[in-house]
Amino acid sequence: MTKELWINLPVENISRSKEFFESIGFELPNSPGNTDSSAVIKVGTKGITIMLFQEEIFKGITRNGLTDTNTGTEVMFSFDLGSREEVNELAKKVKDAGGNVFAQPADVQGWMYGFAFSDLDGHRWNGLYMDKS
């Protein structure tokens, strides 16, 4: 039976990617997976694991080429935030850390407030506050 889901992503520069994700508030725990060619990131209160791998290592693991994130989208990761203010704060942190906010914070479908960004390697993320009242 599956116990956890790990998301694996290729990155061009591990050090830069670690700095980016740490500066926007994602946790980089002490782990043997943190090396010169890989990094472990924990996201959310349930601690979803994202593994970052240097591009050449990732290609070796997957035995496949990489998606060009400048011309296509491989996947979009969505996560919830606690308030509209948290959405706005994270959007600012992403900009300050060098990420690309391609959808500014805005109301979505009348009950959500969110924004979307791409990280330093073009992977797409969507931060949402959902007012379920």
Where are these regions (language model features)?
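Short, flexible turn/loop "capping" segments at secondary-structure junctions
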Residues: 1, 67-72
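N-terminal beta-strand motif that seeds the catalytic metal site of vicinal oxygen chelate
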Residues: 1-19, 76-79, 130-133
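Core segments of cupin and vicinal oxygen chelate
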Residues: 8-56
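Membrane-topology and secretion signals of cell-surface/extracellular proteins
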Residues: 24, 68-69, 131-132
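Vicinal oxygen chelate
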Residues: 31-33, 40, 88-133
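Acetyl-CoA-dependent GNAT
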Residues: 53-58, 130-132
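A short, acidic/glycine-rich surface segment
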Residues: 58-64
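Mid-chain, well-packed structural core segment of small domains
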Residues: 76-92
